[in-house]
UniProtKB/Swiss-Prot annotation:
Protein family: Belongs to the class-II aminoacyl-tRNA synthetase family.
Species in which this protein is naturally found: Bordetella petrii (strain ATCC BAA-461 / DSM 12804 / CCUG 43448)
Recorded superkingdom: Bacteria
Name of this protein: Threonine--tRNA ligase
EC category: ligase
Necessary cofactors: Zn(2+)
Annotated Zn(2+) binding sites: 338, 389, 515
Domain TGS: 1-66
Locations listed in the record: Cytoplasm
Region ranges (Catalytic): 247-538
Length: 650
């Protein structure tokens, strides 16, 4: 007798071994048709995903997985990657298959082929995938020995797959999945038949080196997306279109904010308007430092290699560091700011009464990121962090973490981000410090989030090598997630670098060090801001807050006068005194996302007024200049958007 416990606690008895599919059928025909797999927990074991054909030999807990579950969607995407490889082999028999994992919102598969795949090839492959899916071929799991699998794949000319399998220990039993004439190595699980794969689309082809090594052959990576329903896929494709429209690289070029060029890969050339935006962000964060007990500091860009060895960075991070030599000494260009802040702390002797001691820096860092991973401002080699380090006692740790989370939430709201996700990243395999230290650090982070009422997930093994951290992830206007701020506990670096304070018993002790950043990379955060607002920055951030346009030459002097008046009040204002038609001026400045356009002619000049247009078609009519200045000042003080109604100004 086999007893199966379902998620609602109900139990079903079977006379002998039973498959996941049979359990689903016993519950109902609808569930049996929808079943893609199962989540099984057997006595003494961890939950794991299995195929519908998996046989339950003993009592177990079972949840039927369908397309409505996240695991079910992953199974659909994984199986669609296999369907892609199946279709490619049908159309291009000489192509060799390599790997095909699930990624965010889809999948990819890498192929070796004698010529590049064309857009026409992609269309043909997608059509073939649809044909194979409609055949509803059964997907079956088979177990092979390693040597048999190597021999098989070599015999059919699949050298890459044979190489992968040959690297697996000889005594390990392998699982292969078969659908029609196609067989592939895979742990699984997979959907029960190709007919379950109804909604998918191939997106693009890109290059990828075999095993990620630039010394190896360049393969062709076909990306695709797959979904449970057509509505879900349509929503995703619409989001991609919107993301393309909001691409910070395009907007940065169109609005004359910044540019990139080949002579400086991963680095940014800031134009005047872009740098004005940068300054607003930096000045805001400087006020955050000042208002929350941080002392701003500045540490050197390069430090002797001996210091990076002491911190552990050289052993754990050397491949990402730039180095330089001078007078027979080797220096590392800093990838992080923390060692410099410890040196500042160490420059004097500190009492426990001074703690917590908070340092903040707009620290410029450089990391030797692979050229293929660079992406506009989102992935760069040179960047500036709003980097802070808090030196405190163990007793102060939770308070500091909780206070930081509350501060971070306010900052994000001010910048227009209202949804934050929280993750605690725990100890990685490659780390420094004892398990006892890691236990203390992880507990402190989790308790601080509980105290601030934040629900959080745990990301096992995702912490930095020197300590666990909280990762703060933002959700933007089109639903994308951006990992942004962090706070990280570090018991190790202060000890390694000899940081000490004198406690109440007049004993020297190492402080706890918190690494914290709210924005993270300012470059990346500004890229996020640009995309979140589609380039239309709220007045407090806009590089140019208003443009004064004269209708004709007689009103040009009045336009210039207004511009100077507003500038003297601290506003970022420009004038447009060209002899162009006013409609053209309005259109041009609207395309430049200027929050306010002030139009003045003879009537406005006589009455000392301005006709005000707000971005997005907002018509504020003709008002006194003083009233406009007051409105703009309120916009800046409240950090509100230009189209926000007056009734919700407070």
């Amino acid at each position: 007798m086999v007893q199966i416990t379902l998620p609602d606690g109900s139990q079903r008895q079977f006379p002998g071994p039973v498959t996941v599919a049979e359990v689903a059928q016993s519950i109902g025909t609808g569930l049996a048709k929808a079943a893609l797999g199962g989540r099984v927990t057997e006595p003494g074991g961890e939950p794991r995903l299995v195929d519908t054909s998996y046989r339950l030999e003993h009592d177990a807990q079972l949840a039927i997985v369908t397309a409505k579950d996240a695991d079910g969607l992953d199974m659909i995407r994984h199986s669609t990657a296999h369907l892609l490889a199946y279709a490619v082999k049908e159309l291009f028999p000489d192509a060799q298959v390599t790997i095909g994992p699930v990624i965010d919102n889809g999948f990819y598969y890498d192929f070796s082929y004698k010529r590049p795949f064309t857009p026409e090839d992609l269309a043909a492959i997608e059509k073939k995938m649809t044909e194979l899916a409609r055949k509803d071929e059964t997907v079956t799991r088979e177990e092979w020995t390693r040597d048999d699998a190597v021999a098989y794949f070599k015999s059919i000319g699949e050298d890459y797959k044979a190489e992968i399998i040959a690297s697996i220990p000889a005594n390990e039993t392998l699982s292969l999945y078969r659908e029609g004439n196609f067989v592939d190595l895979c742990r699984g699980p997979h959907v029960p038949s190709t007919g379950k794969l109804k909604v998918f689309k191939l997106m693009k082809v890109a290059g990828a080196y075999w095993r990620g090594d630039s010394n190896n052959e360049m393969l062709q990576r076909i990306y695709g997306t797959a979904w449970a329903t057509k509505d879900d896929q349509d929503a995703y494709l619409h989001m991609l279109e919107e993301a393309e429209r909001r691409d910070h690289r395009k907007i940065g070029r169109d609005l004359d904010l910044f540019h990139f060029q080949d002579e400086a890969p991963g680095l940014i050339f800031w134009h005047p308007k872009g740098w004005a935006l940068w300054q607003q962000v930096e000045q805001y964060m400087r006020a955050v430092y000042n208002d929350n007990g941080y002392q701003e500091v500045k540490a050197p860009q390069i430090l002797d290699l001996s210091l990076w060895k002491k911190t552990g960075h050289w052993d754990n991070y050397r491949e990402n560091m730039f180095t330089t030599e001078s007078e027979n000494r080797v220096y590392g260009l800093k990838p992080m700011n923390c060692p410099g802040h410890v040196q500042i702390f160490n420059a004097g002797l500190h009492s426990y009464r001074e703690l917590p001691l908070r340092y903040g820096e707009f620290g410029q860092c450089h990391r030797n990121e692979p050229s293929g991973s660079l992406h506009g401002m989102m992935r760069v080699r040179g960047f500036t962090q709003d980097d802070g380090h808090i030196f405190c006692t163990e007793d102060q740790l939770q308070d500091e973490c909780a206070d930081f989370t509350a501060l971070l939430q306010k900052v994000y709201r001010d910048f227009g981000f209202h949804e934050v996700l929280y993750k605690v990243a725990t100890r990685p395999e490659k780390r420094i410090g004892s398990d006892d230290i890691w236990d203390k650090a992880e507990t402190a982070l989790m308790e601080s989030l509980r105290r601030t009422g934040c629900e959080f997930e745990i990301s096992p093994g995702e912490g930095a090598f020197y300590g666990p951290k909280i990762e703060y992830t933002l959700k933007d206007a089109i639903g994308r997630h951006w990992q942004c701020g962090t706070v990280q506990v570090d018991f190790s670096m202060p000890v390694r670098l000899g940081a000490e304070y004198v406690d109440a018993q007049d004993q020297r002790r190492a402080p706890v060090m918190l690494h914290r950043a709210i924005l993270g990379s300012l470059e990346r955060f500004i890229g996020m801001l640009i995309e979140n607002h589609a380039g239309a920055m709220p007045p407090w951030l806009a590089p140019v807050q208003a443009v004064v346009c004269c209708i004709s030459e007689p009103s040009a002097d009045y336009a210039a006068q207004i511009t100077q008046t507003l500038k003297k009040q601290g506003f970022r204002v420009q004038s447009d005194l060209r002899g162009e038609k006013i409609t053209r001026k309005i259109r041009e400045h609207s395309l430049q996302k200027v929050p306010y356009i002030l139009v003045v002619g003879d009537k406005e000049k006589q009455n000392g007024t301005v006709a005000v247009r707000g971005l997005g078609g907002l018509d504020l009519g003709v008002i006194a200049l003083e009233d406009f200045a007051a409105r703009l000042a309120e916009d800046v003080a409240a950090r509100r958007d230009v189209v926000q109604p007056e009734s919700s100004a407070n």
